[in-house]
From Swiss-Prot:
One of its GO terms (cellular component) is ribonucleoprotein complex. The keyword Iron does not apply. InterPro entries: Ribosomal_bL9, Ribosomal_bL9/RNase_H1_N, Ribosomal_bL9_bac/chp, Ribosomal_bL9_C, Ribosomal_bL9_C_sf, Ribosomal_bL9_N, Ribosomal_bL9_N_sf. It comes from Polaromonas naphthalenivorans (strain CJ2). One of its GO terms (biological process) is translation. Keywords: Ribonucleoprotein, Ribosomal protein, RNA-binding, rRNA-binding. Belongs to the bacterial ribosomal protein bL9 family. The gene is rplI. This is Large ribosomal subunit protein bL9.
Amino acid sequence: MQIILLDKVVNLGNLGDVVKVKDGYARNFLIPFGRARRATAAAIKEFEVKRAELEKAAAAKLAEMQVQGEKLGGTTVKLTQKAGVDGRLFGSVTNADIAQEVTKQGFAVSKSQIRLPNGPIKTVGDHAINIALHTDVVVDITVTVYGETA
């Protein structure tokens, strides 16, 4: 299916690109989430009329996320979990736990934006993680996990 991208999509293209994707990807993800439209002649003409407005909105969103990224970058998040004497956690710290704690600190972050390079955190100590605020804005923060013995 040919589609017009209304937003930058990772590994696919930028705003305004006409790309061919599988029908299911377009129908079930890109179009319902407002990231793309079918590439009909009428849709292409309509997009060209709105192109400057969409680019301006995308640039404003990027600038806003860069400002938030500068504030959030280098932040340390402290979590306490039950752990054994050897420093291994009973369970793990997931991206949902981290997103909840970052949100408590005043930053609007969803769990889908948290990137755990080594999977869920299962040990006590400092761990470096990434937060993807925007496709072009990824910040590094430190998660410190303290063990709590029962």
